[in-house]
Amino acid sequence: MEVLKKDAALGSPSSVFYFLLLPTLVLWYIYWRLSRAHLYRLAGRLPGPRGLPIVGHLFDVIGPASSVFRTVIRKSAPFEHIAKMWIGPKLVVFIYDPRDVELLLSSHVYIDKASEYKFFKPWLGDGLLISTGQKWRSHRKLIAPTFHLNVLKSFIELFNENSRNVVRKLRAEDGRTFDCHDYMSEATVEILLETAMGVSKKTQDKSGFEYAMAVMRMCDILHARHRSIFLRNEFVFTLTRYYKEQGRLLNIIHGLTTKVIRSKKAAFEQGTRGSLAQCELKAAALEREREQNGGVDQTPSTAGSDEKDREKDKEKASPVAGLSYGQSAGLKDDLDVEDNDIGEKKRLAFLDLMLESAQNGALITDTEIKEQVDTIMFEGHDTTAAGSSFFLSLMGIHQDIQDRVLAELDSIFGDSQRPATFQDTLEMKYLERCLMETLRMYPPVPLIARELQEDLKLNSGNYVIPRGATVTVATVLLHRNPKVYANPNVFDPDNFLPERQANRHYYAFVPFSAGPRSCVGRKYAMLKLKILLSTILRNYRVYSDLTESDFKLQADIILKREEGFRVRLQPRTS
């Protein structure tokens, strides 16, 4: 009887389950390894730091954002062109040779973003940053003309007005050490609202500051998900405090973009086109002129018109095509076509064109418009806020370089407090070199990741990165490649003298990415930054108590400083 009971226990469902579980797992593992044989075979030929069995370098990407970034860069840097890392079963390959970067970024085949971008989905939907295929192509083609120079020139007045507002706000910090990033972040949001979105700040019941802070915190959450194997799981993520906080932040972010679209649609229905903020500026200027004339409307003076005509003639004669606008001179993309080729009807600001296209039957829905607005608001504000903050920090450290920038601005403007013109920005050659050098040493987007659907044969050596791998352009290492830059860790604006650029590989400098998926707003960003930063430096001298060796870099999606961007301002004029 005892024997029968034991036999029955051995034949119970639970015992059969456990008996079959082990061989099932073994067979599954064998199948899984065989299905990845091609990946493992090619990965075995790639150089990289030694990792632990099974987990690879998983523990290197767990921890504080600043330490993760430093560890990954430190372990990759000793390898000349390429470095592989295993994050558990995931193969990540870092490339930082310009020849290899060109292969990846210039291709129309390797354009799929890495799987980590899926965490942006609740925020950005299928906007330009993460969409693929025909949807991405058609929307990119639709949006690109809204960031051509002829459109951007119409924003000059708004760039100036918002820059003067920043200068006024900075008076509260005279002589004190403070974090300039908060000011830069708020300013870039408000400039975006008035230019690309074409709405007035007066229609917003909250400033851009709350939006900017929400975006920064969202980036923290996304980066936490990138670093945690548990938070990557959607179900586990919904059980955490991060999920609730993400919902609150998205209410702020989407609340602003929804309000922007609603405001712009209302203006459209009333037949108003163009920037509402620009209309307000013009109305205010006319009112001031009317008051100066004793309340009598007069025929507009031809003097102002003649001045504008002379300005336009200067712009036409200027070597605009020779300017880089945030990338290596000579590197071209869909933002570099002749402005006359885009047609008069397409010379509309971003949101104007989106709404008009939908109204005229283009294949873009209200949801897709919102996704693109969310994307442009994110990409257009956080990157330039970081870039301008690094620039001011570096000016504060390198007083001799700041002297040359101030001398250049004084030669352009003299003692005048007049607003900058487009022609003025063309003459800010040394300031532009300083800005480009800032973006070289501290690129706002430190990593550009793509997921390979096909093998990628590299040019730098006899290496093939297998399909299924995530290949990442390590922009920080690319921009500090000692074979490209003589003193890669020294801040030297002369790295961007025309003769030096001419001898450099086009893809040795890609702060806004490059190729088909380059940042659609890079020209917008450079023009905005030149006017914003020149306006600040015309009014203030910048100081810093730190050196670059004190910078603790962290990459929460966007490259920033862990300790913040602390500077001190001294007024240049009374």
From Swiss-Prot:
The keyword Membrane applies. Residues 295-304 have a biased composition (Polar residues). It is an enzyme of class 1 (oxidoreductase). GO terms for cellular component: endoplasmic reticulum membrane. One of its GO terms (molecular function) is iron ion binding. The keyword Membrane applies. Its main location: endoplasmic reticulum. It comes from the Eukaryota. PROSITE patterns: CYTOCHROME_P450. Residues 288-327 are annotated as: Disordered. It is found in: Endoplasmic reticulum membrane; Microsome membrane. InterPro entries: Cyt_P450, Cyt_P450_CS, Cyt_P450_E_grp-I, Cyt_P450_sf, Cytochrome_P450_Monoox. Keywords: Endoplasmic reticulum, Heme, Iron, Membrane, Metal-binding, Microsome, Monooxygenase, Oxidoreductase. Pfam families: p450. Its cofactor is heme. SUPFAM superfamilies: Cytochrome P450 (SSF48264). Belongs to the cytochrome P450 family. PANTHER family: CYTOCHROME P450 4G1-RELATED, CYTOCHROME P450 FAMILY 4. Probably involved in steroid hormones biosynthesis. This is Cytochrome P450 4g15. It comes from Drosophila melanogaster (Fruit fly).
